[in-house]
């Protein structure tokens, strides 16, 4: 075996190996994160490998989407299909000759055999042989499972795990189309890419005995395994589309910050001393044994709360940068002034909410909420509040927060009305809704021209709604 590496390098090498059959799931992103943290903590290498042997479902578009999402999350790799490395190729579809060579070697050693199938019935085996078939019939390479053998390994998280081969059947390692099956390819790849630690979801535990049999047959040192508990939905079943969005791309479009999403994924099962943090500052604190051995539930509300905390720790310049980048996902693109962002950020938890919250400041064709119309605009005093507001704001030239507050309180006093009724009537008139940033700050930001034109517009609305 000319390519064989006889001893594992002392350098820690981990890999994230997605199948490019769709989007990057938050469960996959968390697995990538734990691998990334482990590599960085140990000054090792984080490898991206694309497992694209499912020829019917794998696409380069999905591969690119996954890489884009990982980059957006900040989980950059040291070796991979786009940047290369010393252990490539990093796509399984480009490693077929390697798989064939070592599958045939297993046959030569007596650990596997060729299964030849009926030409008209691809499931019917007509011959098993250790000689390479010269027939036109389809054939596979099948690994021979030893009888009544106990297979064991020490999981970094779960401790000793044992399996028996008593109920295991021989399994295909090389398909008739020349492509490898998962359990075989992953062993070949992890060995020749010198992977030292395999951190993956616990749904892979059932794959481990087949992989260990292959390591033993080749006489190769196996990596250390850690199987991470799964992310569940609220009903305690594995997280899926049934529970809501699961794609990293969805959360990106919904206006979540990358560091906030990574922060939340990190605390899903990792016991740390604080809930809000920058994951890049937690590298030295990462210890696999601190990961919970229990499945964890994905809480969408908690994620939104974490995101809001991150949004409020950003400088205004940083928030504006993220906000402008996020606007590529919007149909209406407006230049939102910094001052509007500044007075709005405390009331929202996502960039999308920030956009929706600030839109009335720049979109003069804003709609009035039903709440505002029913609770305030249809009331008989609304016209008096708005007409007096027009007069007083017309007389005001210096739109400071203090002056705006003074005008609004004068309206309440002169009309002998409660401040809430006056404030909410004016708030809805200038912004179309009842939940906004501070009213005094909002009018100060809008300025004289916009404030007056919006009150005038609302007065015109009253006759059309029967107020």
From Swiss-Prot:
Record-linked PROSITE patterns: AA_TRNA_LIGASE_I
GO BP terms in the entry: glutamyl-tRNA aminoacylation
E.C. no: 6.1.1.17
Superkingdom, taxonomy of origin: Bacteria
Compartments where located: Cytoplasm
Quaternary state and interactors: Monomer.
Protein name according to UniProt: Glutamate--tRNA ligase 2
Species the sequence originates in: Fervidobacterium nodosum (strain ATCC 35602 / DSM 5306 / Rt17-B1)
Origin organism lineage: Bacteria, Thermotogati, Thermotogota, Thermotogae, Thermotogales
Gene symbol of the encoding locus: gltX2
């Amino acid at each position: 075996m000319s390519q064989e590496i006889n001893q594992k390098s002392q350098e820690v090498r981990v890999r994230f190996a997605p199948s490019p059959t769709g989007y990057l799931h938050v469960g996959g992103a968390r697995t990538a994160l734990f691998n990334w943290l482990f590599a960085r903590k140990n000054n090792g290498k984080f490898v991206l490998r694309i497992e694209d042997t499912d020829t019917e479902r794998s696409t380069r578009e999905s591969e690119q989407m996954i890489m884009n999402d990982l980059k957006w999350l900040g989980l950059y790799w040291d070796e991979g299909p786009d940047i290369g490395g010393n252990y490539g190729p990093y796509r399984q579809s480009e490693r077929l000759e390697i798989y064939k060579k070592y599958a045939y070697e297993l046959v030569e050693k007596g650990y596997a055999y060729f299964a030849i199938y009926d030409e008209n019935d691809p499931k019917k085996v007509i011959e098993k042989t250790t000689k390479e078939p010269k027939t036109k019939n389809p054939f596979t390479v099948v690994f021979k499972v030893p009888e009544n053998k106990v297979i064991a390994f020490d999981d970094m998280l779960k401790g000793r795990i044992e399996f028996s081969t008593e109920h295991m059947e021989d399994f295909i390692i090389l398909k008739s189309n020349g492509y490898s099956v998962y359990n075989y390819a992953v062993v070949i790849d992890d060995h020749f890419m010198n992977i030292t630690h395999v951190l993956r979801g616990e749904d892979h535990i059932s794959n481990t005995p087949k992989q260990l049999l292959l390591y033993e047959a080749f006489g190769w040192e196996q990596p250390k395994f850690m199987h991470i508990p799964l992310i569940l939905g609220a009903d305690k079943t594995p997280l899926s589309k049934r529970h809501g969005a699961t794609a990293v791309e969805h959360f990106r479009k919904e206006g979540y910050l990358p560091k906030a999403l990574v922060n939340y994924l990190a605390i899903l099962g990792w016991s740390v001393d604080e809930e809000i943090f920058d994951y890049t500052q937690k590298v030295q604190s990462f210890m696999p044994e601190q990961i919970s051995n229990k499945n964890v539930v994905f809480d969408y509300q908690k994620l939104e709360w974490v995101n809001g905390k991150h949004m409020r720790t950003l400088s205004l310049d940083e928030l504006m940068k993220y906000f402008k980048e996020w606007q590529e996902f919007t149909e209406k693109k407006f230049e939102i002034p910094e001052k509007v962002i500044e007075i709005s950020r405390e009331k929202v938890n996502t960039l999308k909410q920030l956009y929706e919250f600030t839109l009335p400041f720049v979109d003069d064709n804003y709609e009035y909420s039903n709440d505002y119309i029913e609770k305030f605009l249809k009331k008989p005093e609304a016209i008096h509040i708005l007409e007096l507001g027009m007069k007083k704001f017309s007389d005001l030239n210096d739109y400071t927060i203090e002056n705006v507050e003074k005008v609004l309180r004068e309206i309440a006093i002169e009309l002998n009305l409660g401040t809430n009724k006056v404030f909410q009537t004016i708030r809805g008139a200038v912004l179309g809704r009842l939940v906004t940033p501070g009213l005094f700050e909002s009018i100060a930001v809008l300025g004289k021209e916009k404030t007056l034109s919006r009150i005038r517009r609302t007065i015109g609305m009253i006759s059309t709604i029967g107020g």
